[in-house]
Swiss-Prot record:
Assigned keywords, A-Z: Galactitol metabolism
SUPFAM superfamilies linked: Aldolase
Function: Component of the tagatose-1,6-bisphosphate aldolase GatYZ that is required for full activity and stability of the Y subunit. Could have a chaperone-like function for the proper and stable folding of GatY. When expressed alone, GatZ does not show any aldolase activity. Is involved in the catabolism of galactitol.
Subunit relationships: Forms a complex with GatY.
Gene3D superfamilies in the cross-refs: Aldolase class I, putative tagatose 6-phosphate kinase domain like
Name of the molecule in the record: D-tagatose-1,6-bisphosphate aldolase subunit GatZ
Family affiliation: Belongs to the GatZ/KbaZ family. GatZ subfamily.
Cellular component per GO, a single term: plasma membrane
Known pathway: Carbohydrate metabolism; D-tagatose 6-phosphate degradation; D-glyceraldehyde 3-phosphate and glycerone phosphate from D-tagatose 6-phosphate: step 2/2
Gene: gatZ
Length: 420
């Protein structure tokens, strides 16, 4: 990461896509996509996804590292080319507890990530805990971030410390996605970004972390990009020029969250304007979902009724029976909620792929389709971009390859934006 940031600050047009997903097919796609390049791949886990208690994936940071490495070994991607990051590390998971208890858990969270070899650490203590004012004072956020930084420094080996990088600040909304429709988004003001940096510098120095400050490579800000269930707010470069000019006076770059569904031109403009770390998550699993739904339609027409996986129906049944991951985000009417379950850009389906019923139905569908020849006309109907690549000899009509290539479409846009 340090080399990439240095190259960007030296004037090169270079950035990096941060893959924020724990889905094995998404991680496989991210690694396979860059297997034959010289680029490193940045894969990040969030604090609610992966933590010392397992998170919603059931994985600790060390488990997640081994999970990613196993996929890398399978696809032939060198482990040393993987950068592991921890996103929103702080009290996000424990906001219902008082600050002392939440921060105690947050300290152990950060230590677990660093011990596991994660080298890009987002210190985010912006969340109010039980009894805290809303919002927190910037000074409090910075002081808590300094506590977390001290925790990271205290367990890092000399070798790890050479690789360790920190990201400070946060975007709006808080991690997890928009819970309601958006019409506009508040772009971070320069004075707020400057205050974030100033308060963190003061808090770090007060804790004896002056050296750690040199490892702060990025600030999270809101450049004016966001999405909800069916709306996308696109990057307007002219609106972010004050931010772009301010960061040039520092040794850092910006990290932009929620960049999913922007155009490839927007990604290039974002990197040009020093938003050099572009995070993506739901767009990748949305592409995965699109591919699986397309294959489910093909299965519906090619496979006898008694042998079909009922993949889409199983997904809907599970999500309706177990609504905890989507209920507070989606609309309430039955038809509306069903549309959101299927097609929301927020893609809350991503929380359900590990469910045993859904996992088994997807596996059944894949086995069914691997045993038949899929007519080209059907691929043209349901996966038209993949049809074109089959025609040009770049791709085979194999279900797994079709899913991979669908995810590659998202990664291709980021490559265009980030490539030197």
């Amino acid at each position: 990461m340090k080399t990439l940031i240095a190259r960007h600050k030296a004037g090169e047009h270079i950035g990096i896509c941060s893959v924020c997903s724990a889905h094995p097919l998404v991680i496989e796609a991210a690694l396979a996509f860059d297997r034959n390049s010289t680029r490193k791949v940045l894969i990040e886990a969030t604090s609610n996804q992966v933590n010392q208690f397992g998170g919603y994936t059931g994985m600790t940071p060390a488990d997640f590292r081994e999970f990613v490495f196993a996929i890398a070994d399978k696809v032939g991607f060198a482990r040393e080319r993987i950068i592991l990051g921890g996103d929103h590390l702080g009290p996000n998971c424990w906001q219902q507890e008082n600050a002392d208890a939440a921060m105690e858990k947050s300290v152990e969270l950060v230590k677990a990530y660093v011990r596991a070899g994660f080298s890009k650490i987002h210190l985010d203590a912006s969340m109010s805990c039980a009894g805290d004012p809303i919002p927190l004072a910037p000074e409090t956020v910075a002081e808590r971030a300094a506590v977390l930084c001290h925790a990271a420094e205290s367990v890092a080996t000399d070798c790890q410390r050479e690789q360790l990088n920190y990201v400070i600040g946060t975007e709006v909304p808080v991690p997890g996605g928009e819970a309601s429709a958006i019409q506009s988004v508040h772009i971070t003001q320069v004075e707020d970004a400057a205050n974030t940096l100033r308060t963190h510098q003061k808090a770090f120095i007060a804790r004896g972390l002056a050296e750690a400050l040199t490892r702060v490579i990025a600030i999270v800000v809101q450049p004016g990009v966001e999405f909800d269930h069916s709306n996308i707010i696109h990057y307007q470069a002219q609106e972010a020029q004050a931010l772009a000019q301010w960061i040039e006076k520092t040794k850092m770059v910006y990290e932009a969250h929620s960049t999913d569904y922007q155009t490839q031109t927007a990604y290039r403009e974002l990197v040009r304007d020093h938003f050099a770390i572009l995070k993506v998550g739901p767009a990748l699993t949305f592409a995965l979902r699109e591919a699986i739904f397309a294959l489910a339609q093909i299965e519906q027409e090619l496979i006898a009724p008694e042998n079909r996986s009922r993949c889409v129906a199983v997904i809907e049944e599970v999500m309706l029976d177990e609504p905890q991951y989507w209920k507070k985000y989606y609309r309430t009417g039955f038809n509306d909620s069903l549309l959101d379950i299927r097609y929301s850009l927020s893609d809350r389906i991503r929380y359900y792929w590990p469910h045993s019923r859904i996992k088994n139905s997807v596996e059944t569908m894949m086995v069914n389709l691997e045993g038949v020849d899929i007519p080209l006309g059907m691929i043209s109907q349901y996966l038209p971009k993949q049809f074109e690549r089959i025609q040009s000899g770049e791709l085979s009509a194999i279900p797994h390859q079709l899913i991979m290539d669908k995810i590659y479409d998202v990664l291709r846009a980021y490559r265009y934006g980030c490539a030197e």
